Amino acid sequence: MELFYRPGEAVLGDVIPFYDAGEFKPFYLKNTRGHAGPDCEEGWHRLSTKDHLHFTEFPAHIRGGTGSVLKVGELYHMFYCTFEDNPRRQFIRHATSRDLERWETADEVLPADGKIYDPAEWRDPFVFWNEGEQKWWMLIATAVLGKTERRACVGLCVSDDLRRWAYREPFYAPMAAAGACECPDLFRMGEWYYLVFSNYCDRFQTLYRMSRSLRGPWLAPERDTLDSRAYYAAKTGTDGSRRYIYGWNPTKELPKKTFNPGNRISRDCCSWDWGGNLVVHELLQNPDGTLRVVPEAHVDAALQTRRPVDVTPVLGGCEASPHAVRLRADCGFGGVLLDRVPALCKLEGEVRFKPGTRRFGIALQVDEQYDTGYYLYLEPGRNRLEYVSGIRFGGRTARAARCSPMRWSWSARLRWRPTVSTRSRSLCRIRCWWSTSAARSR
């Protein structure tokens, strides 16, 4: 069982969701980072799972970048991209299969037209059937030709037969960022269409836009992200009843840019790498049409064995019972240490606080001196949830990340259910679940 799948001696990159014959069969881009072992084939690979916990992996023997997979009749179609340098150019490719295992690459190659779209930014095709137009539409991560570097857009091509494509004006062109709107994805839920894409120049995360028509306008909601920063290249898929979003959580393993202070034991201030661990959420629609992510049901239910927890007071006043801890720190910091958590677990609890409380929360990877650690703070007075590390207080771990503001109700109880997995080698992050090393928690 793996909460956040990662292939052995490799990393998981962009995921191409697909559901077929009662199973989730997402494809993904595999990068071995130079590993030369027996399982060292890079490129497209296919996973098979029924619960997003147990995975079987199969190589697709296709080398190229992100795309999409669809089934028409008894034939599977794969659209992907390839790359050339000197000069830099990118191309859309096409392959077909009858069993998802043996793929035949087609002869046709689709380059950018060089009139509307930049040949150097032309990748990540997403193909779907437009019922209203009675044509196949292809969305492409690209950039329009122009005078500035802020040319990122989602391009559009149309076809009658999935082989001959005509260029159209951009599907979505905000002209707000450099690079491209990577890994575009489109789906409909209720009365709304949703366009999902990622951008590494703007917050390095997955964004979405919403519209009641495929012709737009595409609206950016107040909170236009799915998950948080560094949840990247996420695309969606459905089993016919629920919609899921598949993205990757990056590592910080490669010797690239680093801003870590000297002699620090963490990699918190290193640059994000390309690829890491798979993270799957379920997507739900709010009454106003906006989206939110929640834990996938099988993943959330995977850890149900309860165990008692011992409490060790450290600072402040503490009253402990078998089922509750009351902590009081009127003029300073108070804390207790709980048991060392298992390598794979879910922490679930209920926190009650009084009006006037400035800050409270939990911490992971702390020692008895509270010198190291990662702190999830809830600050009612600032309407903020914040995730920081011990370096702010003179400790040895570097600052991590900050979450978005949140709404509060003083009369409400706060429930928190983070999931902890040390089998994941990815960066410690906070979302509905997170992955980290074995730790004591506060």
Which stretches of residues belong to each language-model region?
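Beta-rich carbohydrate-recognition and catalytic domains
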Residues: 1-124, 128-179, 188-228, 241-242, ...
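Intrinsic-disorder/low-complexity, polar/charged segments enriched in Ser/Thr/Lys/Arg/Asp/Glu/Gln
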Residues: 23, 322-324, 344-348, 421-423
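Solvent-exposed loop and beta-edge segments used for protein-protein assembly and interaction
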Residues: 132, 321, 341-345, 354-356, ...
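Short tryptophan-centered beta-strand motifs in secreted/extracellular beta-sheet-rich domains
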Residues: 186, 347-351, 412-437
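Beta-strand-rich interaction surfaces with strong enrichment in secreted/lumenal proteins
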Residues: 222-223, 333-340, 410-416
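Short, aromatic/His-centered strand-loop micro-motif at the edge of beta-sheets
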Residues: 395-423
